[in-house]
A protein has these predicted regions:
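Juxtamembrane/disordered regions of integral membrane proteins
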Residues: 1-140
Length: 140
């Protein structure tokens, strides 16, 4: 399968992983101070459609970029021959040197947003590994 199709499928997987993490896991009272939800249900419905479309488009772009990068760099991974484990290794390496260090470093100085940074830390790890697993399975 081409990396473009694999990237689009990985983007859909990342979108659903992101939805589960932010819609079902990180919903406690400590997170309520970081989001602005309109007060009425009708206004919430109006806001949700554009927000979900934007999130979906960004997830597709993310999947394409991840698949393209994986296609070009998979030969340098510890897991040789591709596959789901290679995709997850690639995704975790990207996550570790970018998002993990950024959120840990920001948490040192911005202590009031530490709950949001922790949520970002874990949600991106899940999102990256879901997309990496899909890309590793589909790109040969």
């Amino acid at each position: 399968m081409t990396w473009i199709v694999a990237g689009l499928i990985a983007g859909v997987g990342a979108f659903f992983a992101d939805y589960v993490m932010w819609g079902k896991v990180f919903t406690g009272p400590e997170m309520h101070g970081f989001g602005t939800m309109p007060p009425t249900p009708d206004e919430r419905k109006k806001m949700m459609l554009p927000a979900m479309l934007k999130s979906g488009a960004l997830a597709l772009v993310f999947g394409l970029l991840l698949a393209c990068s994986y296609e070009r760099l998979k030969g340098g991974l510890w897991v040789q021959g591709g596959g789901p484990l290679a995709g997850m290794e690639f995704a975790t390496l990207l996550w570790l040197c970018t998002i993990a260090l950024s959120t840990l470093g920001s948490g040192v100085w911005y202590d009031k947003v530490r709950p949001l940074l922790k949520a970002t830390f874990w949600s991106w790890l899940v999102r990256m590994n879901v997309a990496g697993l899909i890309v590793g399975l589909l790109v040969k």
